[in-house]
UniProtKB/Swiss-Prot annotation:
<feature type="transmembrane region" description="Helical">
    <location>
        <begin position="324"/>
        <end position="344"/>
    </location>
</feature>
<feature type="glycosylation site" description="N-linked (GlcNAc...) asparagine">
    <location>
        <position position="27"/>
    </location>
</feature>
<feature type="transmembrane region" description="Helical">
    <location>
        <begin position="188"/>
        <end position="208"/>
    </location>
</feature>
<keyword id="KW-0472">Membrane</keyword>
<feature type="transmembrane region" description="Helical">
    <location>
        <begin position="422"/>
        <end position="442"/>
    </location>
</feature>
<dbReference type="GO" id="GO:0005737">
    <property type="term" value="C:cytoplasm"/>
</dbReference>
<feature type="glycosylation site" description="N-linked (GlcNAc...) asparagine">
    <location>
        <position position="418"/>
    </location>
</feature>
<protein>
    <recommendedName>
        <fullName>Uncharacterized protein C1F3.03</fullName>
    </recommendedName>
</protein>
<dbReference type="GO" id="GO:0000149">
    <property type="term" value="F:SNARE binding"/>
</dbReference>
<dbReference type="GO" id="GO:0051286">
    <property type="term" value="C:cell tip"/>
</dbReference>
<feature type="transmembrane region" description="Helical">
    <location>
        <begin position="599"/>
        <end position="619"/>
    </location>
</feature>
<dbReference type="Pfam" id="PF08596">
    <property type="entry name" value="Lgl_C"/>
</dbReference>
<dbReference type="GO" id="GO:0030010">
    <property type="term" value="P:establishment of cell polarity"/>
</dbReference>
<dbReference type="GO" id="GO:0006887">
    <property type="term" value="P:exocytosis"/>
</dbReference>
<dbReference type="GO" id="GO:0005886">
    <property type="term" value="C:plasma membrane"/>
</dbReference>
<feature type="glycosylation site" description="N-linked (GlcNAc...) asparagine">
    <location>
        <position position="421"/>
    </location>
</feature>
<feature type="glycosylation site" description="N-linked (GlcNAc...) asparagine">
    <location>
        <position position="392"/>
    </location>
</feature>
Amino acid sequence: MSFFKKKLSKGKEILSKSNLKTHTSSNASLSIDDLNRFGFSLNPVLWCLDHQQGLLAIVSSTNRIYIYGKQHVQSVIVPDCSTIVHIALCAAYLIVIDSRNTVLSYPLMKHRDLSKPAATYFLKQKVTCTVTDPTIDWVFFGMSDGSVVPWDVTRHCLGKFKVPNLYVPRHEEWRMMGYSYAPVPGKLSPVVSVQIHPKDLGVILIAYPDGVVLYSIRTDEVIRFYELEYAPGSTAAVLSPHNYRRPIVKGIEWSPWGDHFVSYYTDSTFAFWDVDQEYPVQVRNFVDSNIHTYTPMQRNPPKTELEPIRSMRWCCCEDPTVSFILMLGGLPKEAPVKGISLFSYRNLPAKKDVETFAEFFANPNSQRFFPFIDIPPVRDMLVIPSSSPHYNGSHNPKNLLLLSEDNSLSLLDISTGNISNMSLSIPPSLCFLASDFRVIAFQTVTKKVWNQIEDTISVNSHYSCLFGGSPSPGYLKKLDERNLLITSTGLSLSIWDISQGFMNPSLCVNLDFSSVMRKHLTPSAFITTASFSTYNPEFSCADSFGRVIVCKRKNHKENLPAQLANGIYRLDDTLVLEGTLHAQYYIDLKRGRVTLNQMSNIGFVCIGYQDGGITIIDMRGPHILCNTSISELGLERRGKPDPDFLTSAEFVVMNPKGSPSSIYVVTGTYRGMTLLFRIDPSSSGRFSAYFESSRQLDIKNIYKICSLTQDGQIATATGSSLQSVGYPLPQEVFLVYIGDSGISVFNKINNQVGNLDWRKPVCCRAALVLSTVSKHMGSVVCVNSDLSVNWYSLPNLREERKMQLPLDIDKNRLKEGDILGNGDYIFPTLGAHELAFGCVLGSGRTLANLAPMMLITHNASHVPPRPSKSLWNWLLGEQSTSAEELDILLGGENRAESKVHTLETPKVISARPAESVKQPLTPVPSMTSQSAQSYIPPRRQQQQKGFFAQINDHLAQRGNMLGGIENTMDDLEEMSAEWANEIKDSLAGTKKDLILSGLKSYIP
């Protein structure tokens, strides 16, 4: 339902009351529309990335699960369980494990009530880790009793296969031998980590605190144990905090080629292993290498305390043989700067012996360090791959998502090592988790203005790290105006068009002022306020050091003069495109923090400072029309320790004393004083500002001033209203002052026609709303500190109606939000990093009416081919387990049928954007809303042959190939023998000729 209609008028920039009226009757009932939530509730705890579907799942401290995709794709699941400890995305399912060992399975491939899981299963043991692969329908659970059990995702049950605790017999052997590191009887080592071989699904690495085990699912036996023990007197033994020389395993990572792996330990060391050797190839830490061996000539370095290694990932480039290791932590504790270490290994050595690889891992091709300078210390990192979903999710990553200790997020560009602007790459809601993210303004502009600044989007366009999901088109709620949500991160500004109910990155203008202000850059500077002109593509923003940046569209015909006034500084940017927004100049009067930044619609800017300063700027010069202060005007109250300062301003054309109309600037202060300035043209063609009068109101903190005429039209100064300057006005202008403790309505400046005082609750935000449900001139809608919304009619200020905001809005942070004249509001919620978006001119919509978004857009059964072992290894007898073989090994010959049904003839729709696709992915069908609710993507068909029959087929195929090679070698041998015989005959003939010719030379 719309409460506004469009009215044609001669002036295209007039927003009158008739523009905002509807065809509804005056007694129509109104209620609040709760439209959407932007941001993230409280703090992130866990995360999981499904690169096959391009989805990212993050668990918040409120036990909510947010699932993100491309653009503004977002779904929220609130499971009915205890604290979530593990999540996994596999085969278009979300697997959730809580602290009570309950497994919940949520299907994501269709629209349904995601609050109810498809299956619930109760485990007997605690899950310590999970791992999966995009080509299988299984999730491996590492258990607290040391076992590994597979979870059948599509059958919602555990598999028949189980890996027992592989260290139980080994512990018994240690106790029999009397080793000091043997655990006490009855103590079971839990599983620390499980990793699937990057080229063989039938081989897994299982990490226990005591060591690492290479296990074959195909043969159901242990291949090898890997246990690190330092040599006596070695560097690692000297630095080790343990009495015995065996560190505790903390994690493992496969190499991309699968012949090596790395394990890292609680004493900040990490070891490289060859899968064919029981002894480490190389053991090192951040400082030194070969720290596990001892030689009589070596000198132990001074003891350096290292911080623990928090995480380690072994990634590869487009070519899997070119790899690098990312290590979070492991630095010396006395290091002044923390960061992430990168060890690059570009080319594998041709010689495969242990000594060569020991030297290879000891001396990386390059070693880089990414310091945490502008962000807090990091406690976890997430690799976002850009190519295939294989190689344990670390194939050619471009970005790294960092979770800091203060629960903020940052995005690191791996190629440059710099912190990237998150609004350009990740979902908008996650931008709220940036450490320096701020919501600084919420206001309305005309559609014409938005169309003019929309060209700036292409300058810093959004490129999403995620590609999953199908975004909802939203709803067209506004016709001739746009709601702008303005946010900042440091000196970067983001302008979001949220008129359709979403923060869509494709409708976001990103401006970065750090580059143009590099000569004037102050460390830790950030933008605090911003003000847009409603009818012109220009705005101003202030930073934390009192500088005001003025931005306009680039126009080669409008150039700044060669010499500017004192306090105004030029910002030159030669790379600005014609017709795009850019920072033209900034104002720095050295007066402290900016308390008011008000951009007019007629080319003026009013600035208020913390010291009581008042500055009016004419953008046509630019010129400083007025630079004074409240104390210089003699209006400062005696006995007050802190100076009064401006908090609001309004530009209006009026004739307060019956004289010809002029341009006036009406300002309000924190202590309830109003100041009136008149702007007149001078003989030189410029404008001049003069102080006229002041008045003390019984209102504290006047944060909003509205002007309107007697017939209910907005009287804010616009380009068309300047035509009436110098002439009598046809209607009287009313001024409405709104503060924390009351409202006052004046006409003729000093004639008070309405007054309303309140103490509790406090009016935190208010707006002038013109609608058919309001009588006379309109209504003032006040949002109070108890979340109530009161409507007061103008000019008599009688209460019309009362509403209640959603209860999850934070009543203590209402001043951080705002409400607009069209009834839309933005207020922070109790979620700390979340905003509630709604409208007081609504019909009672709730979040349950929000259109759902499709998360699964790629067929889960069509995955890019998984890397496999080389042909030479295959000829030598090594077998790779396929996904179908793994289904039989884990689920048995009589595995139950999948509970996922298929459609017979799907219709193909567009897949992932071409610029972000490295390998083709098959999309799912295009569906209507009705068929989408029953659609589930097809899964792999059940393998018909038995396991032993498949082995026989593989052996026969290998025998045929080996037989062909044998025949080829026989042919080569025969050809070589014939060629040797020919050479032998030729040499014999040549020798005979030489002998005969020599004999002839002696015969006379």
